[in-house]
């Protein structure tokens, strides 16, 4: 039952049309790690601690959670994380590609806010189409359908965003998307 509930919530988070950012400060264990892996980007503070203690607790860990872990890190690291159940620090998490960056406590919130603003300032249709492509690519290879992404891409080229982006580029100014 737990895997069904968390699996559904994870699919909702991972499938949202808006890019998601995990800001990790402190412990990121078990379900917290699973949630962070559903996000598009993950940033942590130096004192963050990561782990997947399912093996230490006798908990069965779901197929989708392991698949997401394998998408992000190598099979060797995924096995180490799962089989040992040990805790690891921010540097190890970065080495395993579980986080994009490690930022000082005093800078992490501003950095995440700045990145979120940069994303929000970009062409909404392009961001949406990119997100849909990433969602499609995250599916099992047999379930992927590149044709499902074509309308999103075509919509970009026939949009006001595209016209504004080209115009801004030629005028050497920042585009103002709606």
Descriptions of predicted regions:
Residues 6, 66, 75-78, 126-130, ...:
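A general structural signal for well-ordered alpha-helical segments in protein cores
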Residues 43-48, 99-147, 154-158, 176-178:
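C-terminal long alpha-helix characteristic of the crotonase
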């Amino acid at each position: 039952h737990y895997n069904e509930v968390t699996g559904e919530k994870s699919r909702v988070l991972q499938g949202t049309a808006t890019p998601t950012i995990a800001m990790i400060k402190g412990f990121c264990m078990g379900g917290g790690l699973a949630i962070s892996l559903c996000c598009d980007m993950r940033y942590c503070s130096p004192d963050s601690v990561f782990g997947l203690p399912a093996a230490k607790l006798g908990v069965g860990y779901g197929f989708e959670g392991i698949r997401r872990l394998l998408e992000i890190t190598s099979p060797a690291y995924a096995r180490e994380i799962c089989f040992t159940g040990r805790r690891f620090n921010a540097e190890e998490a970065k080495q395993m590609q579980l986080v994009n960056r490690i930022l000082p406590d005093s800078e992490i919130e501003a950095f995440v806010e700045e990145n979120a603003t940069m994303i929000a300032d970009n062409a909404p249709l392009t961001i949406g189409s990119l997100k849909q492509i990433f969602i499609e690519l995250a599916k099992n290879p047999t379930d992927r359908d590149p044709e499902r992404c074509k309308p999103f891409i075509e919509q970009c080229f026939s949009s006001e965003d595209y016209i504004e982006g080209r115009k801004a580029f030629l005028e050497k100014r920042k585009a103002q998307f709606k």
